[in-house]
Regions:
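Tryptophan (W) side chains
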Residues: 3-5
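ATP-dependent adenylation/nucleotidyltransferase module used to activate substrates
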Residues: 154, 158-328, 332, 340, ...
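Short, positively charged and aromatic/hydrophobic N-terminal segments
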Residues: 24, 30-33, 38-42, 46, ...
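Rhodanese-like catalytic fold shared by cysteine-dependent sulfurtransferases
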Residues: 51-59, 63-69, 75-109, 115-173
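The feature marks non-catalytic terminal segments
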Residues: 374-453
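Catalytic subdomain that performs nucleotidyl-dependent activation
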Residues: 243, 321-402, 406
């Protein structure tokens, strides 16, 4: 009798999910194997490799340093927001097998990971079929991050307990992790980050006395840092203003929401969370769902902020966002415009939008994040596993990444290219412009050409 059906992928996956059935089936196969070993041997190898394909965070921690290599399968726009220490970027699908073999030949275990462990498991199973045995990290980067955060919270609790005991004995207290992070803003990153934050507020007149500002937190590094900077500004108490730290849950998956809440707790940011159904609303939209999502999010934030008595919302766009937007407008939109440091809302009377991170460089934000061992998410969309276009401002990742890479390339030739792009919208000479728009009305140079003769 032939047992070729056992090679069916779906059948094997179902067996993997039912251990009792698998044990029974393997016992059955051991009897059949004596009669027909040829067909069974391939199955047994496949079952063995697939049953051992996942590795947990706990198991990963137990591995000796240098005995394994992590391969990050996420794209550049995600890896730029953080990678597991020691990981390298995985090669594309065609080169992945060769990359894995290279590390396996060095006697190392190869561990793949993606955002949640879905794609990495599929890739590991595919490589197993080719006889290349690699592992997939359970839960992916998100699962690793949650496990790490839990560990750090336990360490912080121990520090607090030790400090209580030290206080009673008159011993010196140890700084908590939150205090260390706040200290880094005042000391190490004062010039690169806090001073530029204050400069933007003064230069563009972003904060006035008695303002009540909703600090809009998406969960990424930019908005979380902005929240800490506002707390530091308020600590100086130059004039009175109030803050609300606003988080909108537009339909986050459970893990992403937990990461946001854990980071807020670590950073001592008292967030106010409200829910909406934006993700469900844009789920069926094929064209530009991210753009629509970004527009809808802003509307919800304005509405909730106004309900809470705020007169301003603050967004975490930084210097690099500004210059990329200027260049993208020219290259993809055939227009010259910038991301403004502040705007009056057209739909919510009395409300303003401010961008106090306007002068802060993204590399400095990343340096602050990495120096403090912080980990954030880029897009908390519940479609993160399969969506490759999400970006907080609604622009596709590919376009923004292309523009970012183009600027970096131009900088190799001209080191002033970034500041030149930024200043280009400050030095517009209307006499050298063919046409411009104001309040929706287009004006041509021909309108006044003869009058200027």
């Amino acid at each position: 009798m032939e047992w070729l059906w056992i090679y069916d992928q779906q059948c094997i996956q179902q067996l993997m999910q039912n251990k009792d059935l698998l044990l029974y089936f393997e016992s059955f196969l051991s009897i059949i194997n004596k009669r027909n070993p040829t067909n069974i041997v391939g199955y047994e190898r496949k079952v063995e490799s697939m049953s051992n394909i996942n590795i947990s965070y706990k198991e990963l921690k137990q591995l000796e340093k240098g005995s394994y290599q992590l391969l990050d399968m996420r794209d550049e726009s995600n890896t730029s927001y953080g990678m597991i220490p020691g990981a390298v970027v995985a090669a594309d699908e065609e080169e992945l097998a060769a990359q894995a073999k290279e590390y396996l030949d060095q006697g190392k275990k190869v561990i793949l990971y993606c955002t949640k462990g879905i794609f990495s498991k599929e890739a590991a199973e595919k490589l197993a079929e080719e006889g290349i045995n690699v592992l997939s990290l359970e839960g992916g980067y998100t699962g690793w991050l949650l496990s790490l955060m839990k560990e750090e919270q336990e360490n912080d609790q121990k520090t607090e307990q030790n400090n209580k005991e030290a206080e009673g004995k008159g011993k010196k207290k140890e700084l908590t992790r939150t205090q260390e992070i706040e200290k880094s803003i005042r000391k190490k990153f004062h010039k690169q980050i806090f001073s530029k934050f204050v400069k933007a507020i003064k230069t563009y007149d972003l904060v006035q006395e008695n303002d009540k500002i909703a600090i809009c937190i998406s969960g990424g590094k930019d908005s979380m840092l902005m929240a800490k900077l506002f707390q530091e500004l308020k600590r100086h108490n130059k004039f009175h203003f109030d803050l609300v730290f606003l988080v909108m849950d537009p339909g986050y998956n459970e893990m992403n929401r937990q990461i946001i809440e854990n980071n807020a707790k670590l950073l001592d940011i008292p967030i106010t969370v409200f829910e909406s159904d934006i993700f469900d609303a844009v789920y069926e939209i094929e064209k530009s769902p991210c753009y629509l999502c970004a527009r809808m999010r802003r509307g919800y934030l304005y509405s909730k902020a106004k309900e809470l008595g705020c007169n301003k919302i603050a967004l975490g766009h930084h210097y690099d966002d500004v210059i990329e937007t200027i260049l993208m407008g020219m290259l993809y939109g055939a227009q010259v415009q910038t991301m403004m440091p502040k705007l009056h809302s057209t739909n919510f009377e009395g409300m303003e939008l401010i961008r106090p991170m306007y002068l802060i460089r993204e590399d400095d934000i990343k340096h602050w994040r990495d120096y403090n061992g912080l980990h954030f998410i880029q897009c908390a969309c519940k479609f993160t596993d399969t969506c490759t276009t999400c970006n907080p401002d609604g622009v596709t990742k590919s376009k923004r990444m292309e523009t970012k890479q183009l600027i970096a390339k131009m900088k190799e030739i001209n080191p002033y290219v970034e500041s030149n792009i930024f200043k280009s919208v400050e030095n517009v000479n209307l006499k050298t412009i063919i046409a411009y728009k104001k309040d929706g009305v287009k004006h041509s140079f021909l309108d006044t050409y003869d009058q200027e003769n």
